[in-house]
Amino acid sequence: MRVFLDDERPTPEGWHRVYWPEEAIQLLETGAVEEISLDHDLGDDTHGTGYDVILWIEEAVVVRGFKPPHICVHSANSSAADKMRAGVQTIQRLARR
């Protein structure tokens, strides 16, 4: 499954659209997600951001040995995207252990 977390952009063909971090995390917990593409700003920061998904994946890798999917960041928020990409690099490093 390919998961696309975004509140505004059109969903690419063949992707499953979610709007909130908890929806993405629920799908990740199934183990069926092969690729996930994350936006940061989702319209309501009190409801969470794409970075919350990065944090969940990182913790799941460390605590439970979760095998992360391929992770893409497509956020227009450049500083948040940089932070998310740094998180992806950390996840990749941890997953190789």
State each model region's role.
Residues 1-97:
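Catalytic phosphate/metal-binding cores of nucleic-acid and nucleotide-processing enzymes, i.e., regions
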